[in-house]
Amino acid sequence: MAEEPTYTTEQVDELIHAGLGTVDFFLSRPIDAQSSLGKGSIPPGVTAVLTSAAEAKSKPVAAGPVKPRRKKVISNTTPYTIADNIPPEKLPINTPIPNPLLPLARPHGKMTDIDIVTGNITEGSYKGVELAKLGKQTLLTRFTSNEPVSSAGSAQDPNFKRGGELIEKEQEATIGENGVLHGSEIRSKSSSGVIPGVPQSRPQLASSPAHADPAPASAENVKEIIELLKGLDLRLQTVEGKVDKILATSATIINLKNEMTSLKASVATVEGMITTIKIMDPSTPTNVPVEEIRKSLHNVPVVIAGPTSGGFTAEGSDMISMDELARPTLSSTKRITRKPESKKDLTGIKLTLMQLANDCISRPDTKTEFVTKIQAATTESQLNEIKRSIIRSAI
């Protein structure tokens, strides 16, 4: 972007006065009506042959050298129209108003000199009335992009202009504010016409200022990172759920292990109790009668080691005992007499047997019979006999 020049107030005033003076100088010159050709008086063809037509009717040509006429080369680019009476509030919204005191990118004028007598064509720079008018308009007016209605052309041929065929020249567009564009000389493509022209600049549309900020991070990268984090979070939640299930299963396994240990201990206790019951009361097999068991009984020698408890005494000569000097001697006793047993409290044993009869005997009449016997028993041996009978009946 071209650097914007700065001017002081005094410099701006001087430029304005100089431009106005130049414009007034050229506008105040008299115009000779017979020295120019009218539009209707120019027939189709080469302009050089018209010197004998309309120019011949004008004032006589001086004998001195003829001053070359200048020909305008007009571009068909769309010029800006002057908007002196459009207030700012009636402009479109967000339309910036350029500063009329800033220099605009205007090309230098072009000129083509045609010698009417000799027909020679010369080119050079032209900085005349048109540039003065443009300077005044630049300093005092603002521009809009409305296209003016041109009356210089013909209705049948829009490309026809005074001075010959139009010449188009692409101008380089500027960026941002108006920049300076240097003009270039263009050779006329037509030898017709006597009116000098200046190429018009291309229209410069009003542009809105744009703020330039640093480019943010790529939205695609941010989206990928967020999706990756969401995926990791989902996988982490899945792993946590599986770990919780594993911990719950392990706790159940530990509880089962403890219960199995308790069951093993209980089974061992029951087995011990059953073994104790068998040792204390082996009873009699149900398939062997008592008479057969009694027949199998016969007398056998019995050896008692150690001192006797005094529960019984041996009588008769069929027993051998040891005296004080540990000598075996025949005993004079012939039979064994048992001493009377001491009386004991049998209430607890009776209650135990009653509970055993209620649990093991299912028939009511048998149960009542055993309960009557338990209540009538007076010795411990009778209660033991009743207990054996209850166990046999239960088996």
Curated annotation (Swiss-Prot):
Keywords attached to this entry: Host cytoplasm, Phosphoprotein, Viral RNA replication
Superkingdom: Viruses
Subunit structure comment from the entry: Interacts with host ARHGAP26; this interaction promotes host RHOA activation. Interacts with host KPNA1 and KPNA6.
Residue segments, region Disordered: 178-217
Name the record gives this protein: Phosphoprotein
Role this protein plays: Essential component of the RNA polymerase and the nascent chain assembly complex. Also required during RNA synthesis. Also plays a role in viral growth by promoting host RHOA activation and thus actin formation via ARHGAP26 inhibition.
GO cellular component: host cell cytoplasm
Residue span of region Nuclear localization signal (NLS): 65-72
Family: Belongs to the rubulavirus/avulavirus P protein family.
Region named Nuclear export signal (NES): 225-234
Pfam family, one: Soyouz_module
InterPro entries registered for this protein in UniProt: P/V_Pprotein_paramyxoviral (IPR004897), Soyouz_module (IPR025909)
Stretches with biased composition (Low complexity): 206-217
Entry's localization field: Host cytoplasm
